[in-house]
């Protein structure tokens, strides 16, 4: 019973080597598979793999699904409520909701493909990623930029913000709406906050699909605000047409605080807070980055990154940044880089999803949580604590430990 209780919870680190001598006849528990809601499901022994598949995938959803049809109709009419519900579907890990989200995405993509044939690049949404260190003023800058785009340029703006998730509680503050109150009340703007949920790269799972849904809802530009600056932050550039890096003039030598990777991926650098006593520092920071960029190869042959200064107190400076955004948009559109970049991004995100799915499948596979194939199971249980100990003592790398577990799983 003790072994059964330990196995049903399956914390790999709690089962020690004293169970290695137990015979196969000692193991006869009911296997379980955790559902997406976190509730453990007891499954009968027969047809385990088939039922396991149902936990992960739902093949019963079709084009005629009433939820899909309702959301698609309302989404095409520009409903913000439908857009919010659709993004919730594609972010969900529930098999039925995820299947509905995928079906909805396919219908939206079909519709957008027809629009592209008719209107060309004018039917495409402009994807702008904005990153910067905490406190640089990302939310304030986005609100000022959104006001310029909606009020003076007649654009519909979607803002997707990513907030960090607590590693201890799994919670997230999601406080960007409190910093964008004016934009959140703008009928031509939509703001969606999402937690990272442990995802690396400053973005969250489903954000690429959310961009597609915003395009289907008729928005002209989507602004993606990331968690903050870091070397893994460069993955946000894999879903954007343009990367904008915000810099603060108040932190001394900014060149020491910004990673080279994010600079190389940036198409526009903006020094914020260019007003009052900080104007002199803003000019100095601008000069430093102009000099630094001379030693970096531009990401695109048709565009050289610019370094600008801006202040939310000065609407003309915000308008100048907006002009540079669309100058970039026109340049890559006319050169053909836009279409090529979008195609490459779709391929990269396919492999990103493959990695996520493989991890989920590996953790919940019957070979891991079911004891009929007890040799593989026991080997994994016994290996994990030893591998963790070897990693802590520096005997092996985490990569080698992961490869060892996967090879054991597949019996290689």
Swiss-Prot record:
InterPro entries: GTPase_ArgK, P-loop_NTPase
Localization annotation: Mitochondrion
Keywords (A to Z) from UniProt: ATP-binding, Chaperone, GTP-binding, Hydrolase, Mitochondrion, Nucleotide-binding, Transit peptide
UniProt EC number: 3.6.-.-
Annotated CDD domains: MMAA-like
Keyword ATP-binding applies: yes
Transit peptide: 1-15
Similarity annotation: Belongs to the SIMIBI class G3E GTPase family. ArgK/MeaB subfamily.
Protein name in UniProt: Methylmalonic aciduria type A homolog, mitochondrial
Gene: mmaa-1
């Amino acid at each position: 019973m003790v072994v059964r209780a330990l196995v049903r919870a399956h914390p790999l680190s709690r089962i020690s080597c004293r169970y290695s001598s137990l015979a196969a006849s000692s193991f006869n528990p009911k296997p379980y598979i955790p559902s997406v809601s976190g509730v453990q499901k007891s499954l009968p022994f027969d047809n385990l793999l088939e039922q396991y598949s149902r936990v992960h995938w739902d093949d019963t959803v079709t084009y005629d699904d009433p939820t899909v049809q309702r959301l698609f109709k309302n989404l095409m009419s520009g409903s913000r409520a439908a857009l919010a519900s659709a993004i919730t579907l594609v972010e969900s890990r529930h098999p039925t909701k995820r299947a509905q989200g995928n079906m909805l995405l396919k219908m939206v993509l079909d519709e957008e493909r027809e629009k592209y044939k008719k209107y060309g690049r004018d039917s495409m949404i402009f994807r702008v990623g904005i990153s910067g260190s905490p406190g640089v003023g990302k939310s304030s800058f986005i609100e000022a930029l959104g006001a310029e785009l909606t009020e003076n340029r007649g654009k519909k703006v979607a803002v997707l913000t990513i907030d960090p998730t607590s590693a201890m509680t799994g919670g997230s503050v999601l406080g960007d709406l409190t910093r964008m109150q004016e934009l959140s009340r703008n009928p031509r703007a939509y703001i969606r906050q999402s937690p990272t949920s442990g995802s690396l790269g400053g973005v969250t799972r489903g954000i690429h699909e959310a961009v597609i849904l915003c395009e289907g809802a008729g928005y002209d530009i989507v602004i993606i605000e990331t968690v903050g600056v870091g070397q893994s932050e460069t993955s946000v550039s894999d879903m954007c047409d343009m990367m904008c890096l915000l810099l603060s003039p108040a932190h001394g030598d900014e060149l020491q605080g910004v990673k080279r990777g994010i600079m190389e991926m940036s198409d526009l650098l903006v020094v914020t807070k260019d007003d009052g006593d900080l104007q002199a520092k803003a000019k100095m920071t601008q000069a430093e980055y102009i000099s630094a960029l001379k030693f970096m190869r531009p990401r695109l042959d048709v565009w050289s990154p610019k370094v600008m200064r801006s202040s939310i107190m000065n609407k003309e400076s915000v308008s100048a940044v907006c002009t540079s955004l669309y100058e970039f948009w026109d340049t890559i559109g006319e050169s053909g880089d836009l279409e090529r970049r979008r195609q490459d991004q779709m391929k990269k995100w396919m492999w990103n999803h493959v990695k996520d799915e493989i991890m989920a499948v590996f953790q919940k596979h019957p070979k891991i949580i079911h004891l009929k194939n007890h040799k593989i199971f026991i080997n994994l249980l016994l290996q994990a604590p030893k591998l963790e100990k070897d990693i802590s003592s520096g005997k092996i790398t985490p990569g080698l430990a992961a490869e060892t577990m996967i090879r054991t799983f597949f019996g290689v």
